[in-house]
Amino acid sequence: MKDEHGILIHPYGPHIFHTSNEVVFEYLSRYTTWRHFRHEVVANVHGEYMPVPFNLTTLEKAFKTEAARMKEKLIAAYGMGAKVPILTLMNHEDEELKRVGKYVYDNIYVYYTMKQWGKKPEEIDPAVTARVPVNISYDNGYFADKYQGLPEHGFTPMFEKMLNHENIEVRLNTEAKDILEIK
C-alpha cells in the first residue's frame, strides 16, 4: 500500500523476519542479504514511554515503589526469563500479581488489540492474549530469536528469487483443488 506521497507503507506495521532456526536463516540467506535489526517497541502509557511487551523495565516504570516486591513475586512464581500470558496473571491468586495482569490488560493490551485487529478484546479469542505476554526479564526486544532483520531489498525480491527456480511453476488465479491430487 502506498501513502498519499507514493511511499510504500505497512498498514499493520513492518514485517520483521525472526527465527532461532539456523537452517531456516541459512536457506533464506541464499536469496537475500540482511539488514540486521532488533525490534524494540515502546508505548506511551499515561505520558511515560514503556517497553512492550511488558517486562521488568516496564514494571519499574509503571509501579515505581511497589515494583521491587512485585518483581520478587513474579520471579518466585514463574522464574527469570519466563513469558507469562496476561490471562494467567489476571487469574493469579496473589492480588498484586493479579493487579499487574490487569494493568497490562487495561493499559497496553486493550489498545494493542484494537489497533492490531480492529476489534475490542472481548471479541477476540482469549488465546490471542498469549501473543502479548509479560516477560520476566529486562530484555526490551520484541522478539527473542537469534536471527532478526529485514531483507536488504525487501521481501518481494527475496520471494521472486526463491520462485525463480526450474522446479517451480507460478500459477496465478488458480484454484488449488483444480491442480492438486490427494492420494
Where are these regions (language model features)?
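Dinucleotide-binding Rossmann-like beta1-alpha1 core, especially the glycine-rich loop
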Residues: H5-M80
